[in-house]
Amino acid sequence: GVCGLDNSGNSCYLNAVLQCLCSTVPLVEYLLNQDTQAELAQSKCRLGGVFVQLLKKMWMGGYSSCAPVEARSVLGSILPQFNNYSQQDAQELLLFLLNVLHDDLKKMRSSTLQQRRKQGDKRSIAAAAWETTAVSQLFEGQMSFMTLCMHCDHQAHSSQTFTVLSLPIPTDTSKCTIEDCLSLFFQQTILTGGEQMLCSVCGLRRETTVFTCLDNPPEILTLHLKRFGCKGKNQVKLRTNVLFNMKLNISPFLSSPEQNSSYSLYAVVNHTGNLNMGHYTALCQSTITGTWHHFDDSAVKEVQEDFVQSSSAYMLLYSRRLFQKP
Protein backbone atom coordinates (compact mmCIF):
# COMPACT_ATOMS: atom_id res chain seq x y z
CA GLY A 1 0.00 0.00 0.00
CA VAL A 2 2.99 2.37 -0.30
CA CYS A 3 3.09 3.44 -3.94
CA GLY A 4 3.59 6.88 -5.45
CA LEU A 5 1.42 8.29 -8.24
CA ASP A 6 2.88 10.01 -11.30
CA ASN A 7 1.84 13.59 -12.00
CA SER A 8 0.33 13.81 -15.48
CA GLY A 9 0.02 17.60 -15.51
CA ASN A 10 -1.42 19.43 -12.50
CA SER A 11 -2.86 16.16 -11.18
CA CYS A 12 -1.44 16.49 -7.65
CA TYR A 13 -4.97 17.16 -6.31
CA LEU A 14 -6.09 13.79 -7.72
CA ASN A 15 -3.01 11.95 -6.48
CA ALA A 16 -3.37 13.27 -2.92
CA VAL A 17 -7.04 12.24 -2.70
CA LEU A 18 -6.35 8.80 -4.22
CA GLN A 19 -3.62 8.17 -1.64
CA CYS A 20 -6.08 8.92 1.18
CA LEU A 21 -8.70 6.57 -0.29
CA CYS A 22 -6.01 3.92 -0.81
CA SER A 23 -5.25 4.20 2.93
CA THR A 24 -8.91 3.71 3.88
CA VAL A 25 -8.46 0.00 4.52
CA PRO A 26 -12.15 -1.07 4.93
CA LEU A 27 -12.96 0.50 1.54
CA VAL A 28 -9.94 -1.14 -0.10
CA GLU A 29 -10.78 -4.56 1.37
CA TYR A 30 -14.35 -4.33 0.10
CA LEU A 31 -13.37 -3.23 -3.41
CA LEU A 32 -10.59 -5.81 -3.74
CA ASN A 33 -12.90 -8.62 -2.64
CA GLN A 34 -13.20 -11.03 -5.58
CA ASP A 35 -17.01 -11.01 -5.51
CA THR A 36 -17.08 -7.19 -5.61
CA GLN A 37 -14.62 -7.13 -8.50
CA ALA A 38 -16.69 -9.63 -10.49
CA GLU A 39 -19.95 -7.76 -9.82
CA LEU A 40 -18.39 -4.40 -10.76
CA ALA A 41 -17.13 -5.87 -14.04
CA GLN A 42 -20.48 -7.46 -14.81
CA SER A 43 -22.47 -4.28 -14.17
CA LYS A 44 -19.98 -2.22 -16.24
CA CYS A 45 -19.30 0.38 -13.54
CA ARG A 46 -16.70 2.57 -15.21
CA LEU A 47 -15.15 4.46 -12.31
CA GLY A 48 -15.51 1.58 -9.86
CA GLY A 49 -13.76 -0.80 -12.24
CA VAL A 50 -10.90 1.59 -13.00
CA PHE A 51 -10.47 2.46 -9.32
CA VAL A 52 -10.24 -1.24 -8.41
CA GLN A 53 -7.51 -1.80 -11.03
CA LEU A 54 -5.56 1.15 -9.62
CA LEU A 55 -5.92 -0.15 -6.05
CA LYS A 56 -4.61 -3.56 -7.15
CA LYS A 57 -1.52 -1.90 -8.61
CA MET A 58 -0.97 0.23 -5.51
CA TRP A 59 -1.55 -2.55 -2.98
CA MET A 60 -0.35 -5.69 -4.76
CA GLY A 61 1.62 -4.64 -7.83
CA GLY A 62 5.00 -4.10 -6.19
CA TYR A 63 5.39 -0.72 -7.93
CA SER A 64 7.27 2.20 -6.40
CA SER A 65 4.93 4.45 -8.41
CA CYS A 66 2.25 4.13 -11.07
CA ALA A 67 0.21 6.45 -13.29
CA PRO A 68 -3.55 6.90 -12.65
CA VAL A 69 -4.11 7.75 -16.33
CA GLU A 70 -7.31 5.72 -16.75
CA ALA A 71 -8.82 7.05 -13.53
CA ARG A 72 -8.22 10.62 -14.68
CA SER A 73 -9.62 9.88 -18.13
CA VAL A 74 -12.83 8.32 -16.75
CA LEU A 75 -13.20 11.20 -14.27
CA GLY A 76 -12.94 13.72 -17.09
CA SER A 77 -15.49 11.88 -19.22
CA ILE A 78 -18.03 11.86 -16.37
CA LEU A 79 -17.43 15.43 -15.22
CA PRO A 80 -15.88 17.85 -17.74
CA GLN A 81 -14.56 20.02 -14.89
CA PHE A 82 -11.77 17.46 -14.44
CA ASN A 83 -11.16 16.97 -18.17
CA ASN A 84 -8.28 19.43 -18.41
CA TYR A 85 -4.84 20.13 -17.00
CA SER A 86 -5.94 22.90 -14.64
CA GLN A 87 -5.44 22.70 -10.89
CA GLN A 88 -8.64 21.63 -9.12
CA ASP A 89 -9.85 21.59 -5.53
CA ALA A 90 -9.07 18.35 -3.67
CA GLN A 91 -12.15 18.57 -1.46
CA GLU A 92 -14.48 18.96 -4.45
CA LEU A 93 -12.78 15.99 -6.10
CA LEU A 94 -13.16 13.80 -3.00
CA LEU A 95 -16.89 14.58 -2.81
CA PHE A 96 -17.31 13.82 -6.50
CA LEU A 97 -15.32 10.57 -6.30
CA LEU A 98 -17.31 9.32 -3.33
CA ASN A 99 -20.62 10.21 -5.00
CA VAL A 100 -19.76 8.46 -8.28
CA LEU A 101 -18.32 5.44 -6.47
CA HIS A 102 -21.49 5.25 -4.34
CA ASP A 103 -23.63 5.38 -7.51
CA ASP A 104 -21.50 2.67 -9.15
CA LEU A 105 -21.90 0.40 -6.15
CA LYS A 106 -25.68 0.99 -6.15
CA LYS A 107 -25.74 0.14 -9.85
CA MET A 108 -23.75 -3.01 -9.09
CA ARG A 109 -26.21 -3.97 -6.34
CA SER A 110 -29.16 -3.36 -8.68
CA SER A 111 -27.58 -5.67 -11.26
CA THR A 112 -27.02 -8.34 -8.60
CA LEU A 113 -30.65 -8.03 -7.45
CA GLN A 114 -31.92 -8.63 -10.97
CA GLN A 115 -29.85 -11.79 -11.18
CA ARG A 116 -31.19 -13.04 -7.85
CA ARG A 117 -34.75 -12.36 -8.96
CA LYS A 118 -34.17 -14.61 -11.97
CA GLN A 119 -32.80 -17.27 -9.63
CA GLY A 120 -35.74 -16.81 -7.23
CA ASP A 121 -33.56 -16.05 -4.20
CA LYS A 122 -36.14 -13.98 -2.30
CA ARG A 123 -34.31 -13.88 1.02
CA SER A 124 -31.14 -12.48 -0.57
CA ILE A 125 -33.23 -9.99 -2.53
CA ALA A 126 -34.85 -8.69 0.65
CA ALA A 127 -31.50 -8.37 2.42
CA ALA A 128 -29.75 -6.67 -0.48
CA ALA A 129 -32.63 -4.26 -1.12
CA TRP A 130 -32.00 -2.54 2.20
CA GLU A 131 -28.23 -2.68 2.00
CA THR A 132 -26.36 0.62 1.74
CA THR A 133 -23.08 0.84 -0.17
CA ALA A 134 -19.62 0.59 1.38
CA VAL A 135 -19.14 4.30 0.66
CA SER A 136 -22.23 5.42 2.57
CA GLN A 137 -21.55 2.97 5.41
CA LEU A 138 -18.06 4.41 5.89
CA PHE A 139 -18.24 8.08 4.99
CA GLU A 140 -21.83 9.22 5.59
CA GLY A 141 -22.94 10.82 8.84
CA GLN A 142 -26.04 12.70 9.90
CA MET A 143 -26.42 16.16 11.38
CA SER A 144 -29.56 17.41 13.10
CA PHE A 145 -30.84 20.98 13.24
CA MET A 146 -33.24 22.49 15.74
CA THR A 147 -34.71 25.92 14.99
CA LEU A 148 -36.26 27.96 17.79
CA CYS A 149 -38.61 30.87 17.09
CA MET A 150 -37.48 33.75 19.34
CA HIS A 151 -41.07 35.06 19.48
CA CYS A 152 -43.21 32.02 20.38
CA ASP A 153 -40.55 29.40 21.28
CA HIS A 154 -41.82 27.00 18.61
CA GLN A 155 -39.24 24.31 17.80
CA ALA A 156 -38.75 22.62 14.44
CA HIS A 157 -36.41 19.71 13.73
CA SER A 158 -34.65 18.56 10.56
CA SER A 159 -31.67 16.43 9.59
CA GLN A 160 -29.11 16.21 6.80
CA THR A 161 -26.60 13.59 5.69
CA PHE A 162 -23.00 14.58 4.92
CA THR A 163 -19.74 13.01 3.79
CA VAL A 164 -17.39 15.94 4.49
CA LEU A 165 -17.62 18.63 7.17
CA SER A 166 -16.31 21.96 5.82
CA LEU A 167 -15.07 23.84 8.85
CA PRO A 168 -14.62 27.62 9.15
CA ILE A 169 -11.28 28.83 10.51
CA PRO A 170 -11.16 31.62 13.12
CA THR A 171 -9.89 34.76 11.36
CA ASP A 172 -8.68 36.70 14.40
CA THR A 173 -5.69 34.51 15.20
CA SER A 174 -2.61 33.00 13.54
CA LYS A 175 -3.03 29.72 15.43
CA CYS A 176 -6.02 27.67 16.57
CA THR A 177 -7.03 24.04 17.13
CA ILE A 178 -9.25 21.72 15.10
CA GLU A 179 -11.60 21.75 18.11
CA ASP A 180 -11.87 25.55 17.72
CA CYS A 181 -12.95 25.04 14.10
CA LEU A 182 -15.50 22.40 15.11
CA SER A 183 -16.88 24.68 17.85
CA LEU A 184 -17.25 27.47 15.29
CA PHE A 185 -19.09 25.12 12.94
CA PHE A 186 -21.49 23.83 15.61
CA GLN A 187 -22.05 27.07 17.52
CA GLN A 188 -25.64 28.24 17.78
CA THR A 189 -26.51 31.03 15.36
CA ILE A 190 -29.23 33.68 15.48
CA LEU A 191 -30.88 34.54 12.17
CA THR A 192 -31.96 38.18 12.02
CA GLY A 193 -32.94 40.74 9.38
CA GLY A 194 -33.14 39.25 5.90
CA GLU A 195 -32.14 35.81 7.24
CA GLN A 196 -35.21 35.47 9.50
CA MET A 197 -37.10 32.19 9.09
CA LEU A 198 -40.82 31.73 8.59
CA CYS A 199 -42.37 30.39 11.80
CA SER A 200 -45.16 27.89 11.08
CA VAL A 201 -46.98 28.91 14.27
CA CYS A 202 -46.64 32.69 14.02
CA GLY A 203 -47.15 32.68 10.26
CA LEU A 204 -44.50 35.41 10.04
CA ARG A 205 -40.75 35.67 9.58
CA ARG A 206 -39.16 35.80 13.02
CA GLU A 207 -35.71 35.95 14.56
CA THR A 208 -34.61 32.33 14.86
CA THR A 209 -31.93 30.51 16.82
CA VAL A 210 -30.41 27.49 15.05
CA PHE A 211 -28.78 24.66 17.01
CA THR A 212 -26.66 22.09 15.14
CA CYS A 213 -25.25 18.79 16.38
CA LEU A 214 -24.09 15.39 15.16
CA ASP A 215 -26.81 12.76 15.39
CA ASN A 216 -24.98 9.91 13.73
CA PRO A 217 -21.23 10.43 13.27
CA PRO A 218 -19.63 8.53 10.37
CA GLU A 219 -17.09 5.73 10.63
CA ILE A 220 -14.69 7.90 8.60
CA LEU A 221 -14.86 11.55 9.67
CA THR A 222 -13.52 13.81 6.92
CA LEU A 223 -12.79 17.39 7.98
CA HIS A 224 -12.17 20.08 5.35
CA LEU A 225 -10.56 23.34 6.48
CA LYS A 226 -12.05 26.29 4.57
CA ARG A 227 -8.77 27.98 3.72
CA PHE A 228 -9.99 29.64 0.53
CA GLY A 229 -12.25 32.67 0.70
CA CYS A 230 -12.76 36.23 -0.48
CA LYS A 231 -11.50 39.53 0.89
CA GLY A 232 -13.39 42.22 -0.97
CA LYS A 233 -13.05 41.28 -4.63
CA ASN A 234 -9.88 39.26 -4.11
CA GLN A 235 -9.62 35.54 -3.43
CA VAL A 236 -7.37 34.79 -0.48
CA LYS A 237 -5.98 31.78 1.36
CA LEU A 238 -6.11 31.58 5.15
CA ARG A 239 -2.71 30.38 6.36
CA THR A 240 -3.79 29.91 9.99
CA ASN A 241 -1.89 27.09 11.68
CA VAL A 242 -4.65 24.68 12.72
CA LEU A 243 -3.30 22.38 15.43
CA PHE A 244 -4.61 18.82 15.59
CA ASN A 245 -3.79 15.63 17.47
CA MET A 246 -3.63 12.01 16.40
CA LYS A 247 -6.75 11.46 18.53
CA LEU A 248 -9.94 13.52 18.28
CA ASN A 249 -12.87 13.46 20.69
CA ILE A 250 -16.09 14.85 19.23
CA SER A 251 -18.33 14.27 22.28
CA PRO A 252 -19.11 18.02 22.74
CA PHE A 253 -20.80 18.03 19.33
CA LEU A 254 -22.91 14.85 19.64
CA SER A 255 -26.64 14.80 20.33
CA SER A 256 -26.22 11.55 22.28
CA PRO A 257 -23.17 11.43 24.60
CA GLU A 258 -23.13 7.62 24.88
CA GLN A 259 -22.00 7.23 21.25
CA ASN A 260 -18.40 6.29 20.49
CA SER A 261 -16.82 9.73 20.12
CA SER A 262 -13.11 8.92 19.79
CA TYR A 263 -11.37 9.04 16.39
CA SER A 264 -7.83 8.34 15.17
CA LEU A 265 -6.13 10.30 12.39
CA TYR A 266 -4.94 8.21 9.45
CA ALA A 267 -4.58 10.58 6.48
CA VAL A 268 -4.04 14.27 5.71
CA VAL A 269 -4.20 16.27 2.49
CA ASN A 270 -1.85 19.27 2.53
CA HIS A 271 -1.98 22.36 0.30
CA THR A 272 1.01 24.65 -0.15
CA GLY A 273 1.27 27.83 -2.23
CA ASN A 274 -1.69 29.99 -3.21
CA LEU A 275 -4.90 29.58 -5.19
CA ASN A 276 -3.26 29.99 -8.59
CA MET A 277 0.09 28.29 -7.95
CA GLY A 278 -0.64 25.60 -5.38
CA HIS A 279 0.44 22.03 -4.78
CA TYR A 280 -1.26 19.12 -3.00
CA THR A 281 0.49 16.31 -1.12
CA ALA A 282 -0.78 13.57 1.21
CA LEU A 283 0.33 12.06 4.50
CA CYS A 284 -0.98 8.56 5.23
CA GLN A 285 -0.41 6.04 7.99
CA SER A 286 0.42 2.48 7.01
CA THR A 287 -1.92 -0.04 8.63
CA ILE A 288 0.75 -2.72 8.33
CA THR A 289 3.68 -0.90 9.97
CA GLY A 290 1.98 2.03 11.74
CA THR A 291 4.48 4.41 10.12
CA TRP A 292 3.55 7.61 8.28
CA HIS A 293 4.49 8.31 4.67
CA HIS A 294 4.61 11.57 2.77
CA PHE A 295 3.26 11.24 -0.79
CA ASP A 296 4.39 14.00 -3.15
CA ASP A 297 3.12 12.59 -6.46
CA SER A 298 5.61 9.81 -7.36
CA ALA A 299 8.01 10.69 -4.51
CA VAL A 300 7.35 8.77 -1.29
CA LYS A 301 9.25 9.04 1.97
CA GLU A 302 8.75 7.73 5.49
CA VAL A 303 8.29 10.52 8.06
CA GLN A 304 8.06 10.85 11.82
CA GLU A 305 4.68 11.44 13.46
CA ASP A 306 5.55 15.05 14.38
CA PHE A 307 5.97 15.81 10.65
CA VAL A 308 2.22 15.25 10.17
CA GLN A 309 1.28 18.44 12.04
CA SER A 310 1.75 21.46 9.77
CA SER A 311 0.09 24.73 8.81
CA SER A 312 -0.50 23.30 5.31
CA ALA A 313 -3.24 20.87 6.43
CA TYR A 314 -6.31 21.15 4.18
CA MET A 315 -8.24 17.92 4.85
CA LEU A 316 -8.05 15.52 7.79
CA LEU A 317 -9.38 11.96 7.69
CA TYR A 318 -10.16 10.28 11.01
CA SER A 319 -11.40 6.75 11.64
CA ARG A 320 -13.64 5.72 14.54
CA ARG A 321 -12.21 2.20 14.58
CA LEU A 322 -8.59 1.17 14.25
CA PHE A 323 -8.03 -0.43 10.86
CA GLN A 324 -7.18 -4.12 10.92
CA LYS A 325 -4.15 -5.31 8.98
CA PRO A 326 -5.38 -6.43 5.53
Enumerate the language-model features and the residues they cover.
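Structured, non-catalytic alpha/beta "coupling" segments that mediate domain-domain communication
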Residues: 136-156, 217
